[in-house]
Amino acid sequence: MSFSSSALVFLVAGIYMSSESFHTEIIGGREVQPHSRPFMASIQYRGKHICGGVLIHPQWVLTAAHCYSRGHSPTVVLGAHSLSKNEPMKQTFEIKEFIPFSGFKSGTNDIMLIKLRTAAELNKHVQLLHLRSKNYIRDGTKCQVTGWGSTKPDVLTTSDTLQEVTVTIISRKRCNSQSYYNHKPVITKDMICAGDRRGEKDSCKGDSGGPLICKGVFHALVSGGYKCGISNKPGVYTLLTKKYQTWIKSKLAPSSAH
């Protein structure tokens, strides 16, 4: 996000990606039943979780563009619940290619495809999450966000186990208002805000790239926010609009043809 003077930080575990404090952990949530979210991916650098992601094709993961970093021996882990345990259902992949959206710049268009070097083996613990989103989510809609991010706003370490929290969609008009983000950043039509009126439920550091699911539909990706768990600074998400879905389909088309 173009977070100018209000200083926002992307939700990347262990790495501050922009100004001063844009977040990425699950605040106020709970641990999910192990392996009940089989579409979740952990993007890791040198074996350390940095961002979440979503498996949308056996060889493709969708995540946030700001999760990209040169070097660092990047891998993607599928089928995980605990990041530290040697779970037999885990599948680990080298990354063949990072493809950020061509319009990504300082947070706008914060979406990226990752092509795995080999295709995942789909089974009970590793499954796809299909794109069925529309351009609009009604204000007040309850949604779930999932990730391995921090669980306390003042502790910047990731959660070992997968967490989930229910957040509420906040209208773009309100999120851009003076009492919220005041257009720093501007919440565009390709973005959406979600949080909690009391600031008790939020995404935060380490959750970037994970899914926002509303009534069973994959609508958005975690992007960032100002710190964590602040009522008038909710999480900011990349909305999976028609523009992005068309781009995704164009990139996946050659893979589907094989």
Curated annotation (Swiss-Prot):
Its EC number is 3.4.21.-. Disulfide bonds join 51-67, 143-214, 175-193, 204-228. Transmembrane segments: none annotated. The active site is at residues 66, 110, 208. GO terms for cellular component: extracellular space. Speen, lungs and liver non-parenchymal cells. It holds the Pfam family Trypsin. It comes from Rattus norvegicus. It is an enzyme of class 3 (hydrolase). This is Granzyme K. GO terms for molecular function: serine-type endopeptidase activity; serine-type peptidase activity. The keyword Metal-binding does not apply. It comes from the Eukaryota.
